[in-house]
Amino acid sequence: MRVLVRDLKAHVGQEVELLGFLHWRRDLGRIQFLLLRDRSGVVQVVTGGLKLPLPESALRVRGLVVENAKAPGGLEVQAKEVEVLSPALEPTPVEIPKEEWRANPDTLLEYRYVTLRGEKARAPLKVQAALVRGFRRYLDRQDFTEIFTPKVVRAGAEGGSGLFGVDYFEKRAYLAQSPQLYKQIMVGVFERVYEVAPVWRMEEHHTSRHLNEYLSLDVEMGFIADEEDLMRLEEALLAEMLEEALNTAGDEIRLLGATWPSFPQDIPRLTHAEAKRILKEELGYPVGQDLSEEAERLLGEYAKERWGSDWLFVTRYPRSVRPFYTYPEEDGTTRSFDLLFRGLEITSGGQRIHRYEELLESLKAKGMDPEAFHGYLEVFKYGMPPHGGFAIGAERLTQKLLGLPNVRYARAFPRDRHRLTP
């Protein structure tokens, strides 16, 4: 029966079978040292007289587990049998044991199918999986229902910009930029819903913080009083996500040298107007209606200095910079918010309009065609609760938590302005 590397300590003095990849090799003639890597770690294997295959070959090893203080982890396996299950046919383009994951991003991404085998390259994905697990678990406990919405749609949730068009038989369709309209519809069914799924944005940006395809963690909740209910929910949700990652992916977090954030019980809040005033009067950085990347970075520094917080809610954005479905106030603001983490927007959310006439008026005011949203609008003729929600960008959150230099390292196979493979 197979034993994982992490469990070898319980088998000292016993014969075991290991399955994994040849991580490294050293041939001293009569004696040969191998490092065997499986999903749980690396162990030294001592053998001799073999014609050693290339690194990354898949192996089966049968041998005796013994203690050796000089070996990685203090253990080694003295092999009695080594079988090559699948040989590597050529050297890897990047040496996995000498992994330098912060350098040469084009090379690392071009050969992602190999470089992901490196422990530092795969660590962000392990952390992200834990974050998503915490996301699901917390919402399940709060009586949310997971939903699965269409990804080929007739119109975008936020209008006609930023959409990837696709041919859908004799019609024109688009890749979904958000499940927004569907999750609102499903609030009328389950009251509380969430989805974990990819979304697409056709944006020309080619920066360390932008992806054209990313994993969106979406939440929508009915019968709320206002957007404050949503921010309170997100505070508790993020706390559980961070705890799950720390508890189950702590080795990966430490491997990357990440500074794990403290999580305040109450995230500081600034209205959009207050944020603009602080930027202009205290930080010397005037801004327009929306906040630029630099403005968000400065606000992140301000929150850290003033409150000791890595997190900051910016609330009450102007109606002009929010989607048509955002609940408006009479003063021209909206019941909306963004969550900044270490100076980067990772969440956008707010309360939605829940009355048919007001929603129709808002669509027209934005210059959008109500007919394109017919199925969505019809739902509001039959009663909808006051509701709202938010979406967390999984890759951005992972990037900032781990201090990754590029958001592409937080996705297994990233899609950006220039990358369509692998």
From Swiss-Prot:
Feature type site, description Important for tRNA non-discrimination: P72
Catalytic reaction(s) noted: tRNA(Asx) + L-aspartate + ATP = L-aspartyl-tRNA(Asx) + AMP + diphosphate
Keywords of this entry: Aminoacyl-tRNA synthetase, ATP-binding, Cytoplasm, Ligase, Nucleotide-binding, Protein biosynthesis
Cellular localization per UniProt: Cytoplasm
Main location: cytoplasm
Site keyed Interaction with tRNA: positions: R26, Q44, N68, E76
CDD domains found in the cross-reference section: AsxRS_core
A molecular function (GO) term: ATP binding
InterPro entries from the UniProt entry: Aa-tRNA-synt_II (IPR004364), aa-tRNA-synth_II (IPR006195), aa-tRNA-synth_II/BPL/LPL (IPR045864), Asp-tRNA_synthase_2 (IPR004523), Asp/Asn-tRNA-synth_IIb (IPR002312), NA-bd_OB-fold (IPR012340), NA-bd_OB_tRNA (IPR004365)
GO CC annotation terms, alphabetical: aminoacyl-tRNA synthetase multienzyme complex; cytosol
Binding positions (L-aspartate): E158, R201, S348, R352
UniProt entry tagged with the keyword Nucleotide-binding: yes
GO biological process, one term: aspartyl-tRNA aminoacylation
Binding-site positions, ATP: R201, M202, E203, R209, H210, L211, E345, G393, A394, E395, R396
Family: Belongs to the class-II aminoacyl-tRNA synthetase family. Type 2 subfamily.
Subunit structure: Homodimer. Makes part of a ribonucleoprotein particle (RNP) called transamidosome that allows channelling of the aa-tRNA from non-discriminating aspartyl-tRNA synthetase active site to the GatCAB amidotransferase site. The transamidosome complex is formed by two GatCABs, one dimeric ND-AspRSs and two tRNAs(Asn) molecules.
Function: Aspartyl-tRNA synthetase with relaxed tRNA specificity since it is able to aspartylate not only its cognate tRNA(Asp) but also tRNA(Asn) with similar efficiencies. Reaction proceeds in two steps: L-aspartate is first activated by ATP to form Asp-AMP and then transferred to the acceptor end of tRNA(Asp/Asn).
PANTHER family on file: ASPARTATE--TRNA LIGASE, CYTOPLASMIC, ASPARTYL-TRNA SYNTHETASE
Other facts: Aspartate mischarged on tRNA(Asn) is then converted into asparagine by the tRNA-dependent amidotransferase GatCAB.
Name this polypeptide is given: Aspartate--tRNA(Asp/Asn) ligase
